[in-house]
Curated annotation (Swiss-Prot):
Residues 1-15, 81-138, 184-244, 288-578 are cytoplasmic. It is found in: Cell membrane. May be involved in multidrug export. Transmembrane domains (TMD) form a pore in the cell membrane and the ATP-binding domain (NBD) is responsible for energy generation. Residues 340-575 form the ABC transporter domain. Homodimer. This is Putative multidrug export ATP-binding/permease protein SAV1866.
């Protein structure tokens, strides 16, 4: 896992190395303070060979040099270190999120059907951010603290070997304590992160569906459901906190014993005349420079434990396999005719589930309009979703112009199929930018022309800023009919040879339906058009109507032919016209 993460770090290794070098200088400067104290005590105050004026003179020079170093030299070094560290870590996170976003766009509809959006977002935002601590702590600060400890110990050995050995007495206990606590802490951190992601996933769904909550007046019930998720997170967070508190209490106890031992041994040596008072004072100063980094290392282990847990979750997402892949030798094939052949196609969402579609055979000619009807759950929309490869067939094949759709590059295939759904998604951007999703390189004139053909131009011009009006999240500032017309404008802009209308007008009022149906009639002209419809009055003009029940095609024909047959279609049509 760490090795994989380091692949993201590798391009910035020289910046990290530079950050460590600058950090060594930054952390090395405070090590002058204990030596200054020793000089002030032994070299000036207790130096009976100097007069009072000479003592003041020597002390003034020493303090002046120290002030110059700490006031003039150290601040820019600190700035450079902080800037380098933050720039590097943020750039690495940028690269990880970029890879994750591209990966998410390549994952199929199956992945999104099986995972909460909130949990996915939590991994891209929260977990990636948490891995930043691995960069700052694991790749930078830990090394700086270790180097600080080595330098401090070197100076302490130089000052007095016995005192240094006394300070090192507690090190084995320190290592044992870290070993005992932090394996358990990593597991608890992973559980806490998962619980937090569940809270975020629940919250994301309920905020998006707040209108449903309010319409059924179930705020109290949803508050209870949220409290269950929140309580689960609290329980795991407190368990993590308790174990973390145990570890810090144990570690701090061990590191607090060290200075007490050193002061006791040092005072005895000073009384016996083995060391000077200045040496003891300097040694006590270096104790903080020794045990301070040790305590930070303990905190670093906690931080890294959390970072590793998040890293696990990030790579779990990166390792999600693409179940929709470009086949070997796939090409950006141009669809010239738009003929579709569905050949013995069966489909099931998961291996342990019953098939949704069973041995479907159907040929659709160039420019033909074919409607799929039937009871809900029969497999109409599922069949439609197989054509742009939102899912892959379980068995059989789908051909377009004689080419298996798996021979197309996925992007090339989908770009040549226009899809208008019942609930079209608009992004939180302007009207113009939402239309441009159909073809991002289109000119303003082409955008306006597409809007006119979709019967959208007039209402757009009545908006406060026209085409520059912000539509809000998911197009919340627009009506259902207005959103649908913008989605149709996208298709006009893209001008694909194949058109799929999946319940495109079923949720609209009669006036909006009439306006949109007019635009759809223009849009479907001279294109192979597939329509999924519950409202049968909207598809009586179709060249072919296909009735699907329980995953099988049970009837095929024109409206007139199927009415005359008095079968499944005639039954559905009669019910709707009672």
């Amino acid at each position: 896992m760490i090795k994989r993460y380091l692949q993201f770090v590798k391009p910035y290794k020289y910046r990290i190395f530079a950050t460590i070098i600058v950090g060594i200088i930054k952390f090395g400067i405070p090590m002058l303070i204990p030596l200054l104290i020793k000089y002030a005590i032994d070299g000036v105050i207790n130096n009976h060979a100097l007069t009072t004026d000479e003592k003041v003179h020597h002390l003034t020079i020493a303090i002046g040099i120290a002030l110059f170093i700490f006031v003039i030299v150290r601040p820019p070094i600190e700035f450079i270190r902080q800037y380098l560290a933050q720039w590097t870590s943020n750039k690495i996170l940028y690269d990880i999120r970029k890879k994750l976003y591209n990966h998410l766009q390549a994952l199929s509809a199956r992945f999104y059907a099986n995972n909460q959006v909130g949990q996915v977002i939590s991994r891209v935002i929260n977990d990636v951010e948490q891995t930043k601590d691995f960069i700052l702590t694991g790749l930078m600060n830990i090394w700086l603290d270790c180097i600080t400890i080595i330098i401090a110990l070197s100076i302490m050995f130089f000052l007095d070997v016995k005192l240094t050995l006394a300070a090192l007495f507690i090190f084995p206990f320190y290592i044992l304590t870290v070993y005992v606590f932090f394996g358990r802490l990593r597991k608890l951190t992973r559980e806490r992160s998962q619980a937090l992601a569940e809270v975020q996933g629940f919250l994301h769904e309920r905020v998006q569906g707040i209108s449903v909550v309010k319409s059924f007046a179930i705020e109290d019930n949803e508050a209870k459901n949220f409290d269950k998720k929140n309580t689960n997170f609290l329980t795991r967070a407190l368990k993590h906190t308790r174990w973390n508190a145990y570890s810090f209490a144990a570690i701090n106890t061990v590191t607090d014993i060290g200075p007490i031992i050193v002061i006791g041994v040092g005072a005895y040596l000073a009384i016996s005349g083995s060391i000077t008072v200045g040496t003891l004072a300097a040694f006590v100063g270096y104790l903080e420079l020794l045990f301070g980094p040790l305590r930070r290392l303990v905190a670093s282990f906690t931080t890294l434990t959390q970072s590793f847990a998040s890293m696990d979750r990030v790579f779990q997402l990166i390792d999600e396999d693409y179940d929709i892949k470009n086949g070997v030798g796939a090409q950006p094939i141009e669809i010239k005719q738009g003929r579709i052949d569905i050949d013995h196609v069966s489909f099931q969402y998961n291996d342990n589930e019953a098939p949704i579609l069973k041995d479907i055979n159907l040929s659709i000619e160039k420019g033909e309009t074919v409607a799929f009807v039937g009871m809900s759950g029969g497999g109409k929309s599922t069949l439609i979703n197989l054509i742009p490869r939102f899912y892959d067939v379980t068995s059989g094949q789908i051909l377009i112009d004689g080419h298996n759709i798996k021979d197309f590059l996925t992007g090339s295939l989908r770009n040549q199929i226009g899809l208008v759904q019942q609930d079209n998604i608009l992004f939180s951007d302007t009207v113009k930018e939402n239309i441009l999703l159909g073809r991002p390189t289109a000119t303003d004139e082409e955008v306006v022309e597409a809007a006119k053909m979709a019967n959208a131009h007039d209402f757009i011009m009545n908006l406060p800023q026209g085409y520059d009006t912000e539509v809000g999240e998911r197009g919340v500032k627009l009506s259902g009919g207005q959103k649908q017309r913008l989605s149709i404008a996208r298709i006009f802009l893209n001008n694909p040879p194949i058109l799929i209308l999946d319940e495109a007008t079923s949720a609209l009022d009669l006036e909006s339906e009439s306006i949109i149906q007019e635009a759809l009639d223009v849009l479907s002209k001279d294109r192979t058009t597939l329509i999924v419809a519950h409202r049968l009055s909207t598809i009586t003009h179709a060249d072919k109507i296909v009735v699907i029940e329980n995953g099988h095609i049970v009837e095929t024909g024109t409206h007139r032919e199927l009415i005359a047959k008095q079968g499944a279609y005639e039954h559905l049509y009669s019910i709707q016209n009672l």
